[in-house]
């Protein structure tokens, strides 16, 4: 390895073989190009393993001290950019072991006692993913806070509510934004739940059947912060459920980011015009000088595909594998690494977009909710309150809307006399019920968009998200 400090040599398992690997197969087989990402976790796991071996009398305390000192030296070399594994290291585990032997001599060869790369990589991957989950959960919360800040700024602002992308009923904009806070809360809870199944130690399962070496699995599990142990050694080295489950959880995060992103794209269009994008979160066209493009939500929408693809790839990878470890598992790492990276980047970008990248155009919103038939349901509710059966009221209002459309007028434009021709129970107070703010205020059921109910939601979320300190 030119320029490195790990040294070279044949593979650790090569004494069994008479010929070396074909160079192309060596390149095809190696994972060092990406699993070096697990270096810190590999060092942590190895130090815990060395200390446990000494506690169990397998090696001496002095040898454990030497091993841990060597591992810390490798950590320092990596921090300084001097630890440079090469292709002949195959993976991060061999790279560390070779460097350790180069540093310590025969003592370095004792580290792998009672351990296989199979349980070692499972341990590394779980430690790495646990750390990433612990970073992602606060990111989700940070984005929730950004949404909540926007909601608090628009507690009395109205926006058209849609079904089938057709205007349905006006809602409070804060209520609309809080719907995404709710989705993200489920995402956060899913990540916390996934963490429980990530945080189980496979270390000590060895290759597949356990080890005759007198080890203490509970000692290494405790030292590494695991909540428990795999009870079955075959399951311990074969399990990648946690990788699938995590990828599914992030896929749902991406779904929710993409749904909001799609709405922002729609809101920012000239056809809609509900939001104005800031220069800090939009780009222009190389040809059309008038353009301001919503790149952030478009990229989030597009990046869903790669996360969903990794989830499908993991499922496909493990679906036909016999017990126990198989080389197919090498394919889990790049998928997980990219799922984490993509999810984190998208959360960060959408947080910036919500905090700094858009502003709602209240004049356009006010005009939108006043210029449609989204108050039609309230006419039906008005009639129901006057003892008209709902289905009859529904039919009456449908006829009124049909007439208005043919005449090019809105419900508010009809005279009282005209209204009463449709049903005698209608009085002048109908016009108050048709006002957009009254339409929203009337939705007083728990969880509804009525202003008082929205204030309850805002208060509850401000407390839950500790917004004053966030």
Swiss-Prot record:
GO terms for cellular component: cytosol. It comes from the Bacteria. This is Argininosuccinate lyase. GO terms for biological process: arginine biosynthetic process via ornithine; L-arginine biosynthetic process. Its EC number is 4.3.2.1. It is found in: Cytoplasm. One of its GO terms (molecular function) is argininosuccinate lyase activity. Pathway: Amino-acid biosynthesis; L-arginine biosynthesis; L-arginine from L-ornithine and carbamoyl phosphate: step 3/3. Belongs to the lyase 1 family. Argininosuccinate lyase subfamily. Keywords: Amino-acid biosynthesis, Arginine biosynthesis, Cytoplasm, Lyase. Pfam families: ASL_C2, Lyase_1. The keyword Cytoplasm applies. The lineage of its organism: Bacteria, Bacillati, Cyanobacteriota, Cyanophyceae, Synechococcales. It catalyses: 2-(N(omega)-L-arginino)succinate = fumarate + L-arginine.
């Amino acid at each position: 390895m030119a320029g490195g400090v790990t040294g070279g040599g044949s593979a650790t398992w090569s004494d069994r073989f008479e010929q070396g690997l074909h160079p192309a197969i060596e390149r095809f087989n190696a994972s060092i190009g990406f699993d070096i990402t697990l270096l810190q976790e590999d060092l942590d796991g190895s130090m815990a393993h060395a200390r446990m071996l000494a506690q169990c009398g397998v090696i001496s305390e002095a040898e454990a001290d030497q091993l841990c000192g060597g591992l810390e030296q490798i950590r320092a070399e990596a921090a300084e950019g001097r630890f440079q594994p090469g292709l002949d290291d195959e993976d991060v585990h061999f790279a560390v072991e070779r460097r350790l032997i180069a540093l310590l001599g025969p003592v370095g060869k004792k580290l792998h006692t009672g351990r296989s790369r199979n349980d070692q990589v499972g341990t590394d991957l779980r430690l790495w993913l646990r750390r990433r989950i612990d970073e992602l959960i606060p990111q989700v919360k940070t984005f929730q806070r950004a949404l909540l800040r926007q909601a608090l700024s628009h507690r009395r602002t109205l926006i058209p509510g849609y079904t089938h992308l057709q205007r349905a009923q006006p809602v409070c904009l804060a209520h609309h934004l809080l719907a995404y806070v709710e989705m993200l809360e489920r995402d956060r809870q899913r990540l916390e739940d996934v963490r429980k199944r990530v945080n189980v130690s496979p270390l000590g399962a060895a290759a597949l059947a356990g080890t005759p070496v007198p080890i203490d699995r509970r000692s290494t599990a405790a030292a590494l912060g695991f909540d428990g142990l795999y009870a079955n050694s075959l399951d311990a080295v074969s399990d990648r459920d946690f990788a699938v489950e995590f990828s599914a959880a992030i896929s749902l995060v991406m779904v929710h980011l993409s749904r909001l992103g799609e709405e922002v794209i729609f809101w920012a269009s000239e056809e809609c015009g509900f939001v104005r994008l800031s220069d800090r979160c939009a780009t222009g066209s190389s040809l059309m000088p008038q353009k301001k493009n919503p790149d952030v939500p478009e990229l989030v929408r597009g990046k869903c595909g790669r996360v969903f693809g990794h989830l499908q790839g993991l499922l496909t990878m493990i679906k036909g594998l016999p017990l126990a470890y198989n080389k197919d598992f090498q394919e889990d790492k790049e998928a997980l690494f990219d799922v984490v990276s993509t999810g984190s980047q998208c959360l960060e970008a959408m947080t910036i977009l919500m905090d700094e990248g858009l502003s709602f155009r209240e004049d356009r919103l006010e005009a939108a909710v006043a210029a449609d038939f989204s108050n039609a349901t309230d006419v039906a509710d008005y009639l129901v309150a006057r003892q008209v059966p709902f289905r009859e009221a529904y039919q009456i209002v449908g006829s009124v809307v049909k007439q208005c459309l043919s005449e090019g007028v809105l419900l508010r434009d009809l005279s009282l006399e005209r209204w009463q021709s449709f049903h005698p129970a209608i009085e002048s107070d109908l016009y108050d019920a048709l006002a957009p703010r009254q339409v929203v205020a009337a939705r007083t059921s728990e969880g509804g968009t009525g202003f008082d109910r929205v204030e309850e939601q805002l208060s509850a979320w401000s407390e839950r998200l500790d917004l004053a300190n966030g």
